[in-house]
Amino acid sequence: MSPGILGKKIGMTQIFRPDGQVVPVTLLKAGPCMVVQRKTPSTDGYDAVQLGLVEFIKPQRINKPTAGRLKKAGVEGAKFMREFTLGPGSDDLKTGDQVLVDQFKPKDKVDVVGISKGKGFAGVVKRHHFRGGEGSHGSMFHRAPGSIGASSFPSRVVPGMRMGGHLGNAQVTVRNLEVIDVDTEDNVLVVKGAVPGPNGGYVLVRRSKR
């Protein structure tokens, strides 16, 4: 059994439970995936599996090393590939195997990893939730970051200083989302809550460990 699966975010909607409760859900196009490479402790030093999301991609868009790996695994095209570390009980996976969404069941807990929407350059108030200064009464300090370091010592800006910069477009993990439904015919996974990224963005779905 694979520890996870790759897919795309379709979008959000809502469903109604039998008691009338409204549940916000996200639809994920999960799989089908193929095992592109199987790593073992004897050959690679650790136990892992590389999955590729099967989808059409122009041959000229694939570099030669990747094309060789895909041909060896019998995969026609895979634009999105990720690696999963394997634990006990996953020895049955081998190169060329298919991974489908039917490995998940309703009420399972999953973690979803995606790339958040990019929002361009943002200041410290929007990016780091700084309070800012007074809005009036002669104040000339409104949304400025303020001091970013001392003077003679250490005479530099320390690493990790919260400043303005690119907001979003970063990897985000949402943990312990409940699986509401699984559509094995259309390879659709329905999870409760929101998932990072735009509609059509690639996501990685794995079983929760917490």
Curated annotation (Swiss-Prot):
The gene is rplC. It comes from the Bacteria. One of the primary rRNA binding proteins, it binds directly near the 3'-end of the 23S rRNA, where it nucleates assembly of the 50S subunit. Keywords: Ribonucleoprotein, Ribosomal protein, RNA-binding, rRNA-binding. Belongs to the universal ribosomal protein uL3 family. Coiled coil: none annotated. Part of the 50S ribosomal subunit. Forms a cluster with proteins L14 and L19. SUPFAM superfamilies: Translation proteins. This is Large ribosomal subunit protein uL3. GO terms for molecular function: rRNA binding; structural constituent of ribosome. GO terms for biological process: translation. It comes from Solibacter usitatus (strain Ellin6076). One of its GO terms (cellular component) is cytosolic large ribosomal subunit. HAMAP family: Ribosomal_uL3_B (MF_01325_B). Pfam families: Ribosomal_L3.
